[in-house]
């Protein structure tokens, strides 16, 4: 009775039942929307061919999981799909329901711009965005139990090719499990790990003085993002700050950072924002922010043709010591996004080191003028200039060291490794005797551990409660242990078609801190999976009786550091 009442009272306006008739009735399938396909038979014509119908599962309007009336102390749930299944006979009176199968169509969301190099790129992006929701089919996911003739009928009705289809289970859109209620049962939840204060920047009364004194590193989500937000809020309110510059790729809907920029422009400072309007799925939000900032008087620079800007950079100019200009920079592996900073594992560096800040200023000059800087980059590795070339040189140096019988190794952490040229170089290094340890969360097109080919490469992937998003490259380099944090994965799109930035870590204490984090991950024997030739992704077993779950250990290591800072 509850299910019937719920369907009638809440779902009925949204289900849109329709009989499918080849070449006559072809409903439009919304992108990523869940549907129930129905096999039915006319009760008045039992010998006639079966018919087909389609009903929308309204998960875009209602919760995917519905709590049923239950005795005290018990919790019973039903998934929205099954309420629709239960109700289809009511929607098709006069028909016998033979079976039901779930399906979902994903449409191509790529923005196809014929020519980025002529005309108004922003107008072209806006025009392309308007057509995104009606893009061509790219993937048709269906219930594995669906009969072949039913599938063939649907392929014909919706003009699907064989390679568009993907057989899956009875329920789709597993992302919806993020909505699953917790019923207040704390013992079933992960223990809370509240972000930790980074006291040297959050508690200081002289923010820029603290950064001027030494470099500072935050590691989110273990440490609070408050230091990053404060960087902009302090700059906005500090009367000695004259300029603020930032690259915006993705930002939070309610962004304190953007609000700080608006406050800065209102107080008479010069604010310059480079907005990457080709940030996938954030194009509309970025355009809206651009319009808002421009109306407030901010100088806004937008994407330029052929290249995507993925660097995570900010720059502040401040007058100090008899009105002498001093630069401060924040460089990060992740976006200026307060929300993702709660779940993405990223590093952010605050620095006034002239070797770095002067080159950050050159990156901004390039973004604002599209003129190649006269002076080369000697410290930053910047996509479109020296990123790929310098990474290859550093690998070549390790190869030379190994061939000379000297110690040679690298530790590489990134989201994805796909670039064929870099993979070939890594194979060459392995064959020369260079030792590798790699942490690759996502795509890994390199095959580690293959005898005679890549046996010196050990690779793992860690998927846990936080998304591993930081990119870290460490090269032994004859004992120098050169370390870079970066916005770039080793994918062709990052190394060849984006403005990315890899920045060196010069502070020895920060190097130690990052290396300790990497070693915890490399020793993980709870959530780490081995990437190897067999592609089995088996969990790593270290033979150590002590369970090491790197994200939890990283948090408590950061907590010890935070407690010491606060007590001192």
How would you name each of these model-derived features?
Residues 1-410, 428-432, 444-468, 472-568:
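N-terminal localization/anchoring segments of enzymes in phospholipid and broader phosphate metabolism
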Residues 422:
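Polyanion-binding catalytic cores of nucleic-acid enzymes and NTP/SAM-utilizing transferases
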Residues 435-439:
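Hydrophobic alpha/beta core scaffold segments
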